[in-house]
């Protein structure tokens, strides 16, 4: 067994930072209020550090949930897509009038997102809603930057919303569907190696923090 040291954290963070599509927007909105909860897990260091390196200067952690604890004492189930699980983060967000609430599950491979509506009530997005927003943003920026040339593709699983197909079709990006699991996604990516097709997605740097 080889234990990876902090230099691999640096490699990971640097690669993630290379994915930035709108540094000018971050600079303009650097002080937007973000509340983040790692749910007692692995995201406690890398997520705040990543946000800091992207340029966000006003990130507040939920203190009670910023302590690594495998018993997850402040939640019944550490699933950030459940409103009850996000309650402490949302309570803090209401207190500081946060613009965005983020939470990751203990191994930091799932994310919960909430934002205030016009009445100041925080709306929790589900995974499909978050995906469609991120996908639309990424493809919009790629189009603006001249990166879309008809040789890009995305991949969705059979449990993912069909809105992905609609967004891909709008941007004239091919959409593949596969069974649930990274191995099935990887198989499609592997099948395009050596071609001029380019995969668009987060899988390149997806990792448990």
For every predicted segment, state its role:
Residues 38-44, 108-110, 160-162:
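Gly/Ser/Thr-rich loops at beta-strand to alpha-helix junctions
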Residues 1-85, 91-93:
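Gly/Ser/Thr-enriched, mixed-charge loops and adjacent short helices
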Residues 205-209:
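Conserved small/polar residues in nucleotide/adenosyl-binding loops
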Residues 35, 99-103, 199-201:
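Short glycine-aspartate micro-motif
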Residues 1-7, 117-204:
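Proline/glycine-rich low-complexity loops and linkers
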Residues 45-50, 71-75, 111-117, 164-170, ...:
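Short acidic, glycine/serine/threonine-rich loops at helix termini
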């Amino acid at each position: 067994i080889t234990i990876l040291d902090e230099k691999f954290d640096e490699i990971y963070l640097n690669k993630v930072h290379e994915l930035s599509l709108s540094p000018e927007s971050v600079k303009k909105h650097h002080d937007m209020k973000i509340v983040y909860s790692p749910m007692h897990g692995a995201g406690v260091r890398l997520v705040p550090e990543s946000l800091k390196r992207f340029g966000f200067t006003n990130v507040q952690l939920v203190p009670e949930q910023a302590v690594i604890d495998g018993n997850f004492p402040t939640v019944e189930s550490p699933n950030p897509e459940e409103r009850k699980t996000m309650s402490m983060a949302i309570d803090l967000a209401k207190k500081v009038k946060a613009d965005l609430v983020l939470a990751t599950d203990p191994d930091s491979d799932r994310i919960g997102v909430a934002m205030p509506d016009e009445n100041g009530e925080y709306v929790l997005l589900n995974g499909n809603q978050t995906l469609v927003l991120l996908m639309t943003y990424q493809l919009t920026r790629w189009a603006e930057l001249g990166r879309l040339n008809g040789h890009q593709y995305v991949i969705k699983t059979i449990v993912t919303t069909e809105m992905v197909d609609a967004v891909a079709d709008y941007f004239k990006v091919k959409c593949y569907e596969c069974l649930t699991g990274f191995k099935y996604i990887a198989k499609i990516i592997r099948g395009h190696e050596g071609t001029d097709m380019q995969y668009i997605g987060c899988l390149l740097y997806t990792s448990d923090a």
